[in-house]
Amino acid sequence: MSGPQNPQAGPGGPPSGPPQPGGPPGPPQGPPQPVQQSKRLQQTQAQVEEVVDIMRVNVDKVLERDSKISELDDRADALQAGASQFEASAGKLKRKFWWKNCKMMIILGGIVAVIVTVIIVWAAT
């Protein structure tokens, strides 16, 4: 078997001539490597810009919410102070009317005592 096994190959050399269909697959035919890398870089940069824009919007929303929460907290503090003042005023008013009611009961009791005394004195005579 001294003859060449591949009819396209010379004696002991690599095949010569165009490759036959159905031969070993070569590298995929596509854009050259630098162009593909540039395209991927542009896509990545576009994605980064999109994420940065979204993050800017999110930060703006967080700052807006923070200001609203601060305003709400201030209003809650003012409401708490007003509620405390109302509670103190209501307590004073309650005591005031309780004493007023006690005075009226004492006066009414005195009037009843005078009337009973007058009736007893009048009945005894």
From Swiss-Prot:
Annotated TM spans: 104-123
Region called Disordered, residue ranges: 1-46
Coiled coil listed as a keyword: yes
Vesicular side: 124-125
InterPro entries assigned: Synaptobrevin-like (IPR001388), Synaptobrevin/VAMP (IPR016444), V_SNARE_CC (IPR042855)
Coiled coil stretches, renumbered: none
Similarity comment: family membership: Belongs to the synaptobrevin family.
Protein name (Swiss-Prot/TrEMBL): Synaptobrevin
Organism per entry: Doryteuthis pealeii
